[in-house]
């Protein structure tokens, strides 16, 4: 006979705040489910003695970031953390909204390239355009959309505003209309680093792989996953 028990995650057996570790905790009424609620007088955050649903655990967001950067899919992450896929998708979007784009250093050489993926089905091509700083190998800007000047312009303009020393690209004609000749470089081996980064991305994130059954169902989720992978 299988015994059905509710798995409980104890937060405050010793009445210690799970957010800041302070012991200045007092009772603060009850929740709708009649569970005792506490409030920390130090950080002013509320919590209850235990949570029956693991999505409320304070380390879940850190695990979501870690698993996303390791390339796990939505269902794999939800299965390991024992939370629903709907909750996971909402958390991923929420985490991404709180991530700020890094400040771009002035006078640097940057490489720009585009990578093809798709959303919902393989006929709906979507392009990831991003810029990589040549010295630090870090992603400084990216955009997702159709392969048009509008999509490319958002990335290129951030580099121009940062007073980039050189912007290296491939021979895609669109760049000629967006980048000044004095900044633009299309020399051989000029995009070696970003081409290698493309391979890393396709290996790490299955949704970017060419031959795969994994795909993005939503543009919002795709952008959120990329923000977490690049800047978190």
Where do the PLM segments sit?
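Residue-level recognition of single "structural anchor" positions
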Residues: 1-232
């Amino acid at each position: 006979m299988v015994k059905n028990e509710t798995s409980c995650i104890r937060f405050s057996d010793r009445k210690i705040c799970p957010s800041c570790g302070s012991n200045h905790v007092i009772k603060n009424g009850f929740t709708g489910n009649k569970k005792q609620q506490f409030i920390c007088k130090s950080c002013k955050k509320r919590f209850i003695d235990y949570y029956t649903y693991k999505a409320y655990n304070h380390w879940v967001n850190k695990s979501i970031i870690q698993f996303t950067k390791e390339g796990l899919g939505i269902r794999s992450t939800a299965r390991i953390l024992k939370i629903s896929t709907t909750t996971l998708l909402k958390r991923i979007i929420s985490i991404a909204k709180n991530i700020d784009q890094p400040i771009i250093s002035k006078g640097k050489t940057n490489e720009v390239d585009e990578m093809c993926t798709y959303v919902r089905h393989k006929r709906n091509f979507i392009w990831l355009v991003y810029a990589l700083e040549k010295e630090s190998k870090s992603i400084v800007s990216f955009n997702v959309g159709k392969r048009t000047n509008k999509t490319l312009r958002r990335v290129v303009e951030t580099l121009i505003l940062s007073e980039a020393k050189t912007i290296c690209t491939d021979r895609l004609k669109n760049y000629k209309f967006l980048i000044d000749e004095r900044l633009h470089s299309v020399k051989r081996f000029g995009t070696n680093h970003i081409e290698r980064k493309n391979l890393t991305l396709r290996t790490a994130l299955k949704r970017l792989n060419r031959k795969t059954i994994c795909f993005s169902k939503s543009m919002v989720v795709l952008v959120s996953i990329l923000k977490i992978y690049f800047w978190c």
